[in-house]
Amino acid sequence: MKIRNKYIYTLMGLCVAPLAVSAQVTLSDKESQKVDLGYGVEQSEFLTTAAATTITAEELRRTSAISLADALYGKLPGLNAFQNTGFKGEEGRGATFNIRGVQTTGEKDILILVDGVERPLDRLTVEEVESVTVLKDAAAVALYGHEAINGVLLVKTKHGNKDGKYHFKVGASHKIQFNPQMADMVSAYDYANALNRARQNDGLAPAYTSAELQKFIDGSDPLVYPNVNWKDEVFKNTAHESNAYLSFFGGTDKVQYYTQLDYTDARGLYKNPDQGDWNSQLKYSKANIRANVDFEVSNTTRVSANILGILMETNGVPNVNSSDAWWHLYKVPALAFPIRTAGGVWGGSQTYGDFNLLAKSQGAGFMKTHQRQIWANMTLEQDLDVITEGLKFYVGASYDNSSNTIETRTKGYQYGWNYYSNGVMQETVMGTVEDKLTFNHWVDTQWRIATFNAGLKYALQLNNGDNFGANANYNMKSEIRDGQSNTWYRANWQLALHYDHANRLMADVVLAANGSNRSYPAKWAFSPTIGLGYIFANNPDGILNYGKVRLSGGIQHTDYVPAAGLWLARWSNSHGQFWYGTNFQSSWGAFLTQFPTDDFAQETAYKANFGTDLRIANALDVTFDVFYQQRRNILVSANSLNSAVVGIQSSYDDKGRVASYGMEIGLRYAKTFANGLNLNAGASFSTVKSEILEWIETPAYPNLSVVGGPADAERGLIALGFYKDQADIDNSPIQQFGQVKVGDIKYKDVNGDGVINENDYVAQDYGNTFPSLNYAFTFGAEYKGFGVNATFQGAGHQVKNLRYVDGVWGALSDNRNLSQEYYDNCFDIAGANALYPRLSTENVANNAQNSTIWYSNISWLKLRDCEVYYKLPAKVIEPLKVSSAKVFVQGQNLLSFDNIDAMDAENLNTGYPVMKSINLGLSVQF
């Protein structure tokens, strides 16, 4: 069975990827376009052996996204990008990126470099970016050391030109976001009715009488029997985001410059946040100030300097970030309490305390977050033709610093609830009233990163036209972040060699020694890679204009370890209490809690890639890649090898092994017709498979082994439906999770031992981290200044556990809210057509198990971006000294299709929801 599945995925592991297209591309463009492989190594797209794809600024500007992180959805083959939130400003909550799927059970982050330095992508704006390149195979990422093992995303910012002219460009846009995608929660009546049913199932008396239920329906007593639609009371249905920028650029042969000032302002969804003295509206304001300068000190010396200053401020409710605000909606039911009591204080209750989000957004003050970042880097390149022609020396350094400061101005407020005692309404009031705002502030997070690199590069063209290139480089990086053991130093020594013969045969070799203190004591590793290429067709006038095959392989390493200070034994000073003395004094002793891991090798990736690039009829580009990777020396906990009687957590052992494999095909079509019509189109479809090959485990039954399953697969029980009656329970295997009742989940006895317990768990077919299937379709057309562009993005083959979305698929227990999705499809309401188990006020252990009831193989397709624009004709703008002018209307997420009814399948969480948006704007260049 495993072998058959493996072959199925290999045959289906196809990736059809749309490449960036803007106009008809020629072979000469392939020769002039460069692939930046890092540290001074550039190759023409025509001759490179690397699997890399680049998207230009023109293509990026076809989206309504202001942040670069939000502009890459479905845009680059091999780069899988997903939207996690509808609000900016909170680090770690932005877009998620992945290259070629899950490759390990360890660290899965890709390396993101901006102008050669690791930097956060969501702080950049689209307008300041020249190109984005994704590096995928061993030949492409060989120069970037430990951090590049999962792939690299390179961002190059804009620089000036050499036309001797002075240019400036202005642009402005306003975005309207609407229709937040969140689950509907039940009304107060439905909640009360469900609570009565749940208590009946639990053998308890009803919580509400028929008369009380009627009050929820008719609203005759809204103070004691409220029906509050918290979403409508707290949030609007639209939010706004504005952006404006001004850039100056130009230059001569000696000096080129590019400067830009960009300002973004986004407002959230709170209703009535303005309290006169303060405003608690969710707000995100950011200014980017950039200056990039390139100049020739002499005929042989060239210096480049880039600097970016970022000033960012967010505003909101104290101790309630943008995601927590929405979580409150999923927590508090409509009948919990009214907005205000009879006495006029904010509503609350004994059960939910002051979880009144309206009170928090209007009566608790406000909180601001101030972030300051500076990114600076400089490089110097010196021609050494005086020594030998083609020899150059280069040196570069960078320094980045970030500080995040939080200030709060808070005040207390009273809350309470009404109830009846002897037929008379009473009111309980809690909390204190504070007239003045109390100020507090602190440094939340900070980090600084410094890099240095130096090297020699040599380029030689032989008499027969062959080319030889060499690059010897040393680079180091110092990274200091908050927290213990978060100071990391990395150093790399590298030698890169390139040779191409007769514009047909290419070879690249990289030899690298990579060092890091993060993986101490396994600090150093040797990483060789090789890339080979052969151009079998090069005919601009034929049907097959260009054809190339590529083959690459290499060994890479990562410095990831599952815990900081892994080589140290861990001790606790709060164990082993003993008593002594006549006064019965006590003392705590030291206790070993984890054995050290001090003898291991760095996790190693063995990578292979075969690819081909084709151009057909000077209009259609095809790129095909098939790849295989095996990770070895993955650090795995050795707990399963030791008895729990020892009571000490085991060390780790480097015995894990994971394989990942798939294929990629990229298609693009671009054509300019004689009548001036420009057309471009692309398509994307990708599937990647991972498989655990070796693990430290002692499974009691074969189904408990992780070997053969995906690297990130969840494990759970196989559900057979729900118990129909007591006879069904009596005739089923013994269930050991606790008492079961009619309407509880019925499980399969996988191992056949006659009981249902953790020994019946099985792995899911797909992982939960990223979709294994990714696809996209693009289309664009322009005629006489009018144009349209559209990008569809879709994904599938990702198993998500719906129970993790608390409040939507977790119902009633612990006083949870209840979603309409759960209520309509629970056993009590839907009966034989039920999707979810019976209602209960208890934490029913049987129903809380991970199982196929809760696992969903999600899939979705979105109209991710669309644009309609008009470029003003030259005869209109030239008298105004304008070189180009464009007005546009853009949309994002305007259409969505998925297999999850309650929520957006891409964003199964209770955080700030993703929204549809319309963006109107204008850009003018002088």
Question: Where do the model's predicted regions map?
Answer:
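Conserved small-residue
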Residues: 169-222, 319-320, 672-769, 831
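Acidic/polar loop-and-plug regions of large Gram-negative outer-membrane beta-barrel proteins
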Residues: 203-226, 310, 315-375, 575-587, ...
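Glycine-rich, aromatic-lined ligand/substrate-binding cores of catalytic
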Residues: 769-801
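C-terminal extracellular loops and terminal segments
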Residues: 649-659, 699-717, 763-780, 808-824, ...
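Short, small/polar-rich motifs associated with maturation and membrane association
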Residues: 1-289, 303, 910
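Extracytoplasmic gating/loop element in the C-terminal half of outer-membrane beta-barrel translocons
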Residues: 339-341, 795-887, 891
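Extracellular/periplasmic, surface-exposed regions of secreted and cell-surface proteins
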Residues: 10, 292, 296, 300-301, ...
